Each structure stands twice: as structure tokens, then as C-alpha cells.
Amino acid sequence: MRLMLCFLAVGLAAAEVTVEQVNKAIGLELFADANLWDDDAKAVAGRLNWPQESETTNDASYRLYPKEDYRLFECRPYSCSFLADQNKPTSLSLMFANKGDSVSIGAKDVKDRTKAKARDEQIKDYKKAIAADAKDLEEKLTKLFGKPTLGSMGNAQATREVVRRWNWNGHAFLLAAPKDEYVALRILSVKSADEGGRSRVSDAELFARAKSRVEKRPNGDVILKDIPMVNQGPKGYCVPATWERAMRYMGVPADMYVLAMAGQSGAGGGTSVVAIANGAKAAVTGAYRKIETVSIKVDPGTVDKYIDQGLPIMWAMFSTKEYNEIANGRTKERQGMTDPVAWKKAVADARKGQKPLQPNRNEGHVCMIVGYKKQTGEVAVSDSWGPDYEERWIMGVEATQVSQGTMTIIGF
């Protein structure tokens, strides 16, 4: 009874906090009134000045990678984002000190002792910063709303977070700080937080949705639309960012920072595809989806099996300078080309004398195969680098030359 009275007292105290007090504590005009969830998402993005990251038929995301002097709760955030469904905000995520953004020198960039020493210092500093941000944020939120309650988010051991939770007018403020990983403050509806952030899209609905996303263009392109974009930013998070895209596309809630923890990403980036798959498995299967790993040649005649079902393919490859030059140039050249026969001849002429692409093991990368064109032997790829990289085209034979041989599909 005493415990219930304590929770009730905390709840009443938090309810008395005004919108103005909350916005002042955050340092941002987040709330126009006491209910964020009925606001127009574009209006929210406008007053926050956060750019749109992605928009699909059903949802949208907005993300800002702030400058160094940007502050929220008087702490430095490295990534600020929110998701919206049917143009209404559904969740907000603030990522403070973390091992991905706080370490700018990746392991593969260490060429000499000076770089090695600088990287070691960054690793020491980010671990201290995580502890400091976690302490400061908890103190500020407690001062604002009262003492937190303890809970957890996520339905899988590898992606589960212990959180400190404060409720305010239908909003749950959740602070997570896994040791040496990151400090995240998320704002969800109380209902969503009570459900652990989980959601469920029925198989029938998802199957119909996936089939409707297969676009067959008059020029012969077959392309998947409505794949969420997640911009990994400057860190080496291509694997967790791509997995977040695929999981959200298949109706499974995901966050690249949590997936990076599950995949045991190194400081500054660098993640094992196998470790990510193992870490995400429980979340994917818990949503009644399945993970399939295949080793196939990158070719329209092999990827069509999945694309025609509305399923994107996560592809492990080597993203070399030469590969990207070809993909960028080819994509630009093919714009406006409506005749597959003429385009096939143009590509063949351009490739005369072209040397085979050479894989570089220092340029490991994971992206998506999202389309194909059988008349020309092309495949479409999508990278987690923002809208400019949502759809690029490359010959299947060229893609095979830089392929690591592993592809992963989240299916029904």
C-alpha cells in the first residue's frame, strides 16, 4: 500500500509540471501543448528544425545529426530523431554519448602510432562521457518529474534495455545507459512504453503490404518502394542501420544503436553480420518473421525470387571507390532512359575495356538489393547514407565482383 501511495505521489507531482517547464528543461520547443501524439508530424519537425530522413506510405522519420554546440538537457546529443505514423508522432529518440558517434577514428583508420593514441584517448573519453551523461540526465529528469521507476524495453535478451522511467501527461520518458554502449533518452506514449515498445503487424496485412510495394516501371525496372531510410551518419554503422531499415520495413520495431550493441559493434563502428543476425533473431522471430541467409550470385535471375515477393535483400559486399564511381555514374546516366534495348547497348559500350572490379577487404559494407532489370542485367542497391543513396544501379556481373557472397532476408 505504501509503495502504491509513493507511485501515486510521484505521478501527481509529474502531472503538475507545465509544458513550459518541460520545454525549458529540454532546451527545445518540443511540446506545443500537453499532448505531442496528436500533433502534425511535419509541424513538429518544423519547430524542432529536424530534417526529414524518410517518408513511406505509412510512416516517416526525421533525424538531425547536430553540431557540437547543440544541447538538450544541457548535454550534447549526437543524434536526434523521431518517428511518425499517419503523420502523427509515435516516438522520439535522443542519443547522447555513445561508442558509435563519439569515436571518430575507426579501427581500420589507425595507420600509425599517433592515430592509435588518438583513438585510445577517444575510447577513454567516450566511456567517461557515457557515465557523465547518464548521471546528468537522470538528475535533471528527477528534478523535473520526481523519482523514476525501473523497467525494461525490448523482448530479446540481446536488445533488451534496462530503463529509468518518468511518466508525464501520457508521455513516458525512458532513459537507457548500457555500460560503455550509449546513453539514450526516448519519449513514447505511456501505452507503448507499457507494451515494451513492441508492435504487431498481422501476417496477412504485411503480406499484402509487401506485394503492393513491388513497382514495375514502364522501362522494365522492378523496384521496391516504401523502404524506410536510416542515415547512419559519419560512423561505421552500415550493418545495424541496414538491419533497422529491413526490420521496420517488415513491421518489427528497431533502433540501429540497440542493434549495434547486440552486434557487438566496435568503437566508431564495424559490426559482424553474424553477430547482428544473432542479436536481432529473437526480436524478428518474436514478431513472427523469419531470417534467411543465402549465398547466391548477384543477378536479376536470382534476386527476383525475393524482390517479386516485396522482400529487400541485405547484401554484404565491398564498397570500393571504383564500385561507387560506376554506381553513381550509371545511375545518373540511366535517368530518363525509357528504351531498355538502347540502354543495354549504351552500358555494353561503356563497359568495353573496363577492368573487373577488385574487392578490398578494408571496405566491407552492408547495403540492400531493392530491384532488378532483366533486360539489361542490372540490380538496384540502396545504402544507409541518406536519400541520395536510396536507389542506385549496377550491373549484376559488377556487383558479383565485389560481393562477399552472403545475403540475408527477413521474410514471412
What are these regions (language model features)?
Residues 1-7:
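Sec-dependent signal peptide recognition
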Residues 16, 35, 39-41, 46-158:
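Long, charged/polar, surface-exposed segments that mediate recognition or autoinhibition
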Residues 16-41, 49, 53-54, 160-286:
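Active-site-adjacent structural segments surrounding the nucleophilic cysteine of cysteine proteases
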Residues 75-78, 159-161, 168-172, 361-367:
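Short, surface-exposed coil-to-beta transition loops
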Residues 150-154, 253-260, 288-298:
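Surface-exposed patches in mature extracellular/periplasmic domains of secreted proteins
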Residues 167, 184-219, 341-412:
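Noncatalytic regulatory segments and standalone regulatory/sensor domains
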Residues 233-237, 244-245, 264-270, 298-300, ...:
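Solvent-exposed loop/turn segments at secondary-structure junctions
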Residues 270-374:
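Predominantly the structural core of cysteine protease catalytic domains
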